[in-house]
Structure formats: structure tokens, C-alpha cells
Amino acid sequence: MSELDKKMKSSKKPLVRFRGWIQAAATLLTNIHIPNLFKGKIYQGNVKTMCVPGLNCYSCPAATGACPIGAFQAVVGSSKFKFTYYITGFFILLGVLLGRFICGFLCPFGWFQDLLHKIPGKKFSTAKLKPLRYLKYVILVVFVILLPAFVTNSLGMGDPFFCKYICPQGVLEGAIPLALANSGIRSALGHLFTFKFTILALFIILSILFYRPFCKWICPLGAIYSLFNKVSFLKIQVDHEKCVGCQKCSRVCKMDVNVVDTPNHPECIRCGECMKACPTDAICYHYGFSNKKKADNK
């Protein structure tokens, strides 16, 4: 396929063509209070009570809203824990509307990993590491739900275990900017910061070598959205009348999805790379319900 043909195909799919710009815009909107990065102050206005769709630390000085995973842990770990209709409804609503499109287009930490993976150098496939996919579901159940709910202090409150002990985004967006702007915070940094910074450094290195290791193996938010991939309104649709079975789509998929057989696999982040690779234009986005037989979403 010539470069002209590729450009013509991508122009028909603006979401795919402008994905990088959409990710940048989403990150900016999620962290709109840029001056706070230099002041070392966390925005705490009324909007902060609302969750953003992607993984974005509440403690980031620039953060527009709350991280949904952090907010969920705060409710689960509360001494007055009640079923959180708002946050659970938030997950269900976005999951049904978009699925893991949020991971592919709207998540700041996902974009950060994408940028790291663009650094020139040898890259490695994760195709043989597929069992590690299930680790993120274990982390969701254990660190986001069970530990905050059952490991509590004398007041009956649990820590946000995932945020406190695992999440590298908290160090990248929260601890580092706050420490750079506040000498008091710098002097208070201890072993926990060192441990979390080591996790961040590890995922920076892994993201250069592998595509989105945090999204694939660790992220509990991605685990939640993945549960809705097969039922979300936004889907990847394969026209089997056009498909020639070349498997180019599956070979370019960095999330290790067999696009032809399972286009809406839980790991699919709707990035659109399969659409760009398809020589017959057999793959497209579809929004809503479809009874067409050619849309094989099994």
C-alpha cells in the first residue's frame, strides 16, 4: 500500500488520525490548572468532587477532578462505608458508552506510556506474557476493594492501598511536583516515596521496551473498563465480506488482540492501529447496536 493510500484511509477515520492530539487535549483538560504546578498547591474547588475518566492523581496540583480509583477507595475505606452509587454508576456509564476507548484516547498515564514507547530502541513483544493480563484484576479486587474495606485503623478507616503503595501516577503527577515546589514536603519524603519512585522508574523503563505494560498488567481502572468492552456502544466492527484473512490487523495490534476473531476483546483499547493496517478497509468503529452478521463481535 502506497503512502498516499495510507493517508487517504486515515483521513476517513479522523479519530485514528488525530489520536495523539486527542490524547494531549484530554490530558490538558484533565490537568487544566497548570499554574498550580509551579505554586505547589492542589486545586480543591467544587469540580474536584467530580471524577475524571482516566487515571489521574487527585494530588496533582494541576488536576481538574478526582481519580475514580482513588475516589472509590476513599468510599470503600470510609468508616461509614455505604455502596457508592455515584462512583459505581460512573464506571458503568463510561464503560457502557466507551469501554476501553478511555484507555486508548483519554487516559493521561496511557498517553505517557505511548510517548515513552516512541523513544527509539529495541522493542519487545508481550504476546508470550498474556497471563500477566489477569494481574490487574487481582490488584482491583485486593488493593482497591478488599484491603481498604477490611484493613482499617482504630477509627474504622482503611488506607487507599493502591494509591499509597502501587500507583506510579501519584508519584509522577503528585509527589514530584509538590516536592519540587515545597521544601517542607521534600524534607518529609521517606522510604515510601523511594519505594513508589522505584515503581515509577521501573514502569518508565518497561514502557520504553514494551507497549503499555502498566495498562496491560497493573491498572485496575483498565480492568474495570475492560469488563464492558464487549457490550459498550462503541465497538470495533469487522466486515467479514471485505476481510481477506491476511491477519495484518492482529500483527500490528500492540495489545495482542486477535482482531478478526475477537475485535472487542477486553484488552482492546480502540486505538485504531488495526484499521490503518487493514488493506481492504474491513475494520471500522461502530457506535450503537448492530444486528449485522458482518459485525463479528463474539
Residue spans of the language-model regions?
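Non-ligating segments of multi-cofactor redox enzymes
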Residues: 1-260, 266-298
